[in-house]
Amino acid sequence: MPLLDATRRRAGLLLALAAASLFVGTAAGADAWPSRPITLIVSFEPGGSTDISARAVAQALAVELKQPVVVENRTGAGGRIGTKAAALARPDGYTLLWGSGSSLTAAPVLYPDQGHVATLVPVSLGATQSFVFVTNPTLGARTVQEFVALAKRQPGQLNFASAGMGSSNHLLGEIFLAATGAPVVHVPYKGAVMAKDAVIRGEAQLMDEVTSPLIGALRAGQLVPLFMTGERRDPAFPDIPTAAEAGLPEMTIQGFFGLLAPAGTSPDIVARLNEAMRTALASEPVAKAFGNLGFTTAYSTPEQMATRIAEGRATYARIVKARQIRVD
C-alpha cells in the first residue's frame, strides 16, 4: 500500500506540475503578444487613400507594439475580398484589417455573401472623411436648390455618375435623390476617376466623392461644389456649405476608416491594440499623412466604432429598400 500511495502521489504531483506549466505557458503567450510581425490587410489597391492611410498607421503601430506591421493589399470586388480574408483569419492578433466604411456598411447590405463582415471585432476608428457633391460648371447651378430646380424642369435629362452599382457614392447619391426628389438618372461608371471625368466633360451633371480625389478639379474650377456631408465645414474648403447648411441635415454622413480584428480575438489584445491606436493616431507622421489626404483623425473606443458601423448599415439598408437597389 505505501508503494501504491507513493505512486499515486507522484502521479498527482506530475499532473499538477503539467497543469501549472500549461497555465503559465498560456499566460506567458498572451503576455508576450506580439512576438512576431503583424499583417494589416488593406482591401484596396496600393497608392489609394485607404492604402496610404493604412501604411501611416502601420508604421506608427509598429513603433508602439515593437513589432513590424506589414500592409498586405488583398484587392478585388470593391474591397469585399480583403475584408472576407481578414474576417476568416485566425483570431490570434497577427492578422488585422484596415477597414473602410463602404466595406463595413454598404457591402453587407447589398451582398448576401458578406455576412462574415458582421463578425469582425472593432478596435478603433482611425479617420473620417466628408463627401462633396459636385456638378459641372456649365450647368449653371451653384446651390442644391438651383440644381434641383434645373433637374425638375427637365426630368430624366440630367445624369448622376457613380463609381459603380452599390458603391458608397452610389448609395449616398440615392439618399440625395430621395431627399430632394430630383428626377436624375443614375449612370454607374467603372470607378470614381471615370465618374469624375464624366462630370468634368459634361456627360454627367452630378456626383459625390470623398474630397481628396477632387481637390485638383475643385481648385481648377472644373467642378462646382454644392455641399459637403461633414458636420462642420472643411478648413481646406471653407466656402463649401455643410449638408445641414444646404437644407439637407439627413445627409450628414461621413466616410470612415478603422482597425478591426477577426472574431474571437482576445479582449486583452483588442484593448492593447486600442491603446496603441490612441498613441499612433496622435503621432505627427499620421497627422501629416491624414492631413494630406483630407482626413480627420478619429480615435474611438471599440464600442463607439461598433455603433458607427451599425448606424451606417441601418442608413444604407433603408435607402436600398426604399429605392429598390439591386446589384448583380
Language-model segments: which ranges?
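An extracytoplasmic/periplasmic, membrane-proximal ligand-sensing/linker region
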Residues: 35-37, 179-180, 267-328
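Hinge/capping helix and adjacent helix->loop/strand transition within the periplasmic-binding protein
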Residues: 88-94, 109-194, 243-245, 256-289
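Twin-arginine (Tat) signal peptide motif
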Residues: 1-17, 22-26, 55
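Stable alpha-helical elements in mature extracytoplasmic
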Residues: 49-53, 57, 82, 102, ...
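N-terminal (or domain-start) structured segment
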Residues: 29-119, 156-159, 181-206, 210, ...
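Short beta-strand->loop
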Residues: 115-125, 161, 183-187, 205-206, ...
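Short coil/turn segments
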Residues: 45-47, 101-102, 136-141, 162-167, ...
